[in-house]
Design a protein with these regions (language model features):
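Bacterial N-terminal signal peptides that target proteins for export
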Residues: 1-9
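Auxiliary, metal-adjacent structural segments of Zn-dependent hydrolase domains
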Residues: 33-103, 110-115, 161, 166-173
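Long, well-structured alpha-helical subdomains associated
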Residues: 162-193
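Short active-site segment of divalent metal-dependent hydrolases/proteases
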Residues: 122, 126-130
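C-terminal motif of bacterial Sec signal peptides marking the signal peptidase cleavage site
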Residues: 18-19
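Post-HEXXH active-site segment of zinc metalloproteases
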Residues: 115, 119, 131-164
Length: 193
């Protein structure tokens, strides 16, 4: 059963976006559905059940709004964010960016856990932004004193880590726990047979 204090809004276009917001107050930060309704990006697809979490992030975190808006304003990239629960993966999340002729890019953000999703989404979206800015991770990973680390074919940046932590702090613990709880519930429903 849904939380009695929640109001859900579905917006359909080329993408389905579901945003849930507390219906008790009227501040922009407590009504992510209104923010998302005005700011749905055609080049960013957020898969079920992450839409309410992203809506909350957009309404509460100026840092995430900046990253999201930067990516949304680009015509040369398409981003997909999806939850793919997998306990056998050695990482919690991964972003794969592919480049095509003409400068087009496709970024696939996959979260393999329902833990710390606010932090992970922000962290991975910052990696997309880094790539759009032309960050050369391979070159930086071998530079002395660099904030980029290489692990086999994967890279990690201090900027991504710090952005994830900052957004999680801006969103706040209560909203993060609510998001994680709804994801666990949705995962149980979506993956139970």
């Amino acid at each position: 059963m849904a939380n009695p204090g929640m109001l859900c809004l579905a917006i359909s276009a080329a993408t389905l976006v579901t945003a849930c917001a507390a219906a008790r107050t009227t501040t922009p930060h407590s009504q992510p559905d209104r923010f998302v309704a005005r700011n749905v990006a055609s080049n960013i697809r957020v898969g079920f059940p992450l839409q309410p979490c992203v809506a909350t992030m957009l309404s509460r975190s100026p840092t995430f709004r900046e990253t999201y808006s930067t990516i949304a304003g680009r015509h040369d990239v398409r981003v997909t964010i999806e939850l793919v629960p997998n306990r056998t993966k050695p990482v919690r999340a991964v972003t794969e960016v592919r480049s095509f002729a003409g400068g087009q890019r496709v970024a696939a953000v996959r979260l393999y856990t329902t833990a710390d999703v606010i932090e992970l989404i922000a962290h991975e979206m910052e990696h997309v932004r880094e790539q759009l800015e032309g960050t050369n991770l391979l070159l930086l990973s071998v530079a002395r004193g660099s904030d980029v680390r290489r692990f086999g074919t994967k890279f990690e940046t201090r900027r991504g880590v710090e952005t994830g932590l900052r957004v999680a702090a801006e969103v706040g613990g209560t909203a993060s726990r609510t998001c994680q709880g709804s994801l666990r519930d949705a995962s149980l429903i979506a993956y139970s047979f």
